[in-house]
Amino acid sequence: MGKRPDIFRPGCFSANDATYGVLCDLGFIGGGVSIPGRIWLERFCVWSGAYPYAHFAHGAFRQCSGALPFVEIPLSVDLTTPLRYNPVGFHHHPDLRPGGVYSETDEVAYDRRQLLHGILQRTAADDPPIKTLVVDVHNDRDFTSGDSQAAKDLSAVLDGIEPECLALGWEVVPATYDEVIRHYSAVHGSSVQRQIKRSNAEPAGASDA
């Protein structure tokens, strides 16, 4: 590769409460480890209740924000849609991926533009400090053929982003993971450092119980 990787995404979004700490020890600065709401026990993937927007990862509990020097940028899912069962074997909130989990076509059909609308409307209501839209795209799909369902799904998402954002008064800013991670760290890193200093200053045995 020519350089040491510093951004991480696990297959199937598998993780446990030790994952973020290990990633930090290995030099990773951020990535997309979580998929809010998915429950897939066979893949060691449980993200029920996970914080759905960019945040610093937690060292003891993967589901919430914390103070680790790892910027987590979750996959965007439609939280306005109730948890549904996917026949591949998991429960989830639908996301914008083109095609299915392991196939060119959906296991369960979804209107990508409707999902996009739900995701952005929920983001507007929650108003997180940094608003991101993350789509899971697999490189084994055919995005060149007009007959490809994956290509149609991706086009529906891409064609819908600007009008949906304009309706909310937002400017669309294309960005890589690295750019978002470094921007988030620059803007919010000082508050995390203060939190770490406060924690280190607490007397032994202090508790919020």
Give, region by region, the residue ranges found by the protein language model.
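C-terminal domain-boundary segment and adjacent tail
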Residues: 102-209
